[in-house]
Amino acid sequence: MTNIPVSKNRSWIAHLHKGIDQMDGRSKAAIMRPAGVACASDLLSLCEKYLGKKVDSLENLVTGWNLVREGRHLTGRWVIEGSSITGVFSECGCPLVRSGLIELHPVQCYCSQGLMETIFSRAAGKPVQVEIKRSIGRGDEVCEFSIKL
């Protein structure tokens, strides 16, 4: 099998994103959220590695995720405020974007939303709602997410 250059993969995914972007918001989310669900277990494992124990609460998840971000020199953090959790970040948190494997595109934010819904719901023991308030991928200066418990 021939090795395909990263640039070819990046181009192919960019065109896929462009096609998905032609759809309505509900369809975009339906396609991209499952990709984030697939990444949730990887992030949960990282949080547990940095914590040195299983994530068994929202507090542990927030602490672990903030430790992961600090360990990777990423700015911004998660904060628990009553019945919601807010995160404001200065860069896209997607490791595929940060590594250069894919280019940042607005539809990627639905992927992040799926990841957050999965990981926060698991830690909360119930479904949560994730609102994308601002997004670098959509032209804002920061990414801001609100988790409604």
PLM features per residue range, with description:
Residues 1-107, 128-136, 140, 149:
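N-terminal accessory segment detector
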Residues 145:
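Conserved SAM-binding loop
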Residues 107-125:
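Active-site helix/loop of acyl-thioester processing domains in fatty-acid/polyketide metabolism
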